[in-house]
């Protein structure tokens, strides 16, 4: 997918759930106790570290779900770089509303900016090649949509959103079905022409069998060393899209991209990204 934003209504259910979790049954009782309802402020959402911004759309929605009268101005758009001390967003209106939405807005923005920033580092390592960086389904339960959106903001690409998006034959499928040929023949018998088929291999002889049998659009080269990946690219000779996966850490990306694979997929983009330090100041 190539989108870098979504309609607000698509994102709202995830944000509403987070607000309900945070506000609880009785709402923000601290703010109600100490802040007069007519108190107004302008708050600034600041970056405290350098990175690539994500989650500004979601932060805006969070503030507006709590109070539609808040005036929210996004100063740095999703996908843009940020520097320490830079103001990313201003929020003007009832102080109580701003405080009640603060933590949810910051949690989303910090988490997603961390993912976008790590993705951008991976993408930078592919410079000078045609290799693309893609994420996986190793996402936080319930947050896959927004975490994959953050990958796009960092310059990466998305893999499947769900098991229903494409056929991806993994090692356990191959073992249960009786081998590469058996699983590909079974897939060819039922797969629609609209459905992409990807198969995982971890040995070159399996790749050779995939090429001989046919029926796959993409081959996932799992846990192969760099030299084996280079041989796999030569064997495929452009007949299939090749995706390298398994142990794809940042320090290895440049050498893997240089082998000529089409994609490098890494679960680390979403499961290992560190939240970027953002703050909200009055």
Which residue stretches match the model-derived regions?
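Active-site loop ensemble at the mouth of alpha/beta enzyme cores that anchors a bound cofactor
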Residues: 279-282
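Acidic/glycine-rich phosphate/pyrophosphate-binding loops and surrounding catalytic core
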Residues: 2-213, 218, 227-235, 241-243, ...
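Short secondary-structure boundary segments
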Residues: 222-223, 246, 267-268
